[in-house]
């Protein structure tokens, strides 16, 4: 692509975050002749993928998880392993010759007329023609403010620190939280030699098979993503009854709300990668939600007291965007989430984009790839028009 002086802004587009979302936007911008600089606070791309637990694989298929301009190698298999995702991201950055600056953290973003000023590590003040925030859906570990937690002397860690079951061999472990991470860690512990595994559940999740009769759950998510919520709820219930065992006797009754309703509230379905069989076999015991920590014990919602050797809190993450953007009007909602995403900008902040802050049932990487192209197209069009 050839560019004219009008198409070349004085300042680059800054992309904050060197994960898949940020890399995809940078590559899509470069493809359109727009200079993009990726700012990554760690020392390498794909930082979060490097620290995920060992057994993690994509819950989406290889064919539907590639980023713009580079397919995931067929040799990685249908369900790509964590380490292979890292290798793919490294290759992606190399192939597209992306301009990446590591070891730089952005602390604050300010509007400066038609441009943006980023305040970063080492007193840097960087001026960009546009900014894409791609710091990640799972940014900062969230730990509930349980009563008595400060005085608890037992072993407590967030799921972000979990790597494999080896340190928990023979131990009594309580996993708190029944999302995808908590469910998989519980299954991993049960299969990996933990003495006892309990899973504390507050809201019963929707569980789906990764594949049903060879058909990936992701493809179903793509097909139904534009259907009315009530319709998807009914379809989800039919599939649950036909293809999933009744786990009510094991502490996992039918969820109170439908699958799509819960997804709209931010709770994606749990893909089964071992939890169902572990629960049915009694290797994972479902218990009530954690209410407090008291006298060295964990107090559950049903009044039960337990004293596990270790507690792993799979209690989610915060976006942690408030320090970066909380001072700007009309950018974040009351929960600290971006008011828009993809190719849309907040009304009061033209030139500010958000990438990767949704978790759709059609697959996060797939949607990152789609949104990256849309964002790049929008930015390039604005530059060509002299905006």
Go through each PLM region and give its residues:
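Flavin (primarily FAD) cofactor-binding/catalytic cores of flavoenzymes
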Residues: 2-42, 46-48, 77-217, 221-387
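A short acidic, helix-capping loop that chelates divalent metal ions and anchors anionic groups
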Residues: 71-77
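Redox-cofactor-proximal catalytic regions of oxidoreductases
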Residues: 44-71, 99
């Amino acid at each position: 692509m050839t560019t004219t002086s009008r198409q070349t802004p004085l300042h680059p587009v800054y992309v904050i975050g060197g994960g898949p979302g940020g890399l995809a936007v940078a590559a899509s911008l470069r493809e359109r002749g727009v200079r993009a600089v990726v700012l990554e606070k760690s020392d390498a791309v794909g930082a979060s993928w490097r620290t995920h637990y060992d057994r993690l694989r994509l819950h989406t298929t290889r064919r539907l998880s590639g980023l713009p301009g580079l397919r995931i190698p067929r040799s990685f298999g249908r369900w790509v392993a964590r380490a292979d995702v890292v290798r793919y991201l490294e290759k992606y950055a190399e192939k597209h010759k992306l301009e990446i600056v590591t070891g730089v953290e952005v602390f604050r973003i300010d509007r400066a007329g038609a441009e943006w000023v980023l305040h970063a590590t080492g007193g840097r003040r960087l001026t960009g023609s546009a900014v894409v925030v791609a710091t990640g859906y799972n940014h900062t570990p969230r730990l509930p403010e349980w009563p008595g937690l400060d005085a608890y002397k037992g072993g407590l860690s967030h799921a972000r620190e979990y790597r494999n079951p080896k340190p928990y061999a023979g131990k009594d472990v309580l996993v708190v939280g029944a999302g995808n991470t908590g469910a998989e860690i519980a299954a991993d512990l049960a299969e990996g030699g933990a003495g006892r595994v309990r899973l504390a559940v507050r809201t019963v999740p929707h569980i789906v098979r990764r594949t049903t009769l060879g058909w990936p759950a992701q493809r179903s998510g793509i097909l139904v993503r534009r259907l009315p919520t009530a319709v998807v709820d009914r379809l989800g219930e039919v599939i649950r009854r036909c293809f999933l065992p009744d786990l009510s006797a094991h502490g996992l009754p039918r969820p109170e709300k439908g699958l799509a309703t819960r997804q709209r509230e931010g709770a994606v379905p749990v893909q089964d990668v071992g939890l169902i069989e572990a629960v049915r076999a009694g290797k994972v015991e479902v218990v009530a939600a954690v209410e407090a920590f008291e006298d060295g014990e964990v107090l559950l919602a049903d009044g039960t007291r337990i004293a596990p050797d270790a507690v792993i809190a799979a209690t989610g993450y915060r976006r942690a965007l408030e320090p970066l953007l909380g001072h700007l009007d009309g950018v974040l909602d009351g929960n600290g989430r971006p008011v828009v995403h993809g190719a849309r900008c907040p009304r009061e902040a033209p030139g500010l984009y958000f990438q990767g802050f949704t978790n759709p049932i059609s697959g996060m990487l797939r949607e990152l790839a789609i949104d990256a192209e849309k964002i790049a197209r929008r930015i390039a069009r604005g530059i060509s028009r002299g905006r």
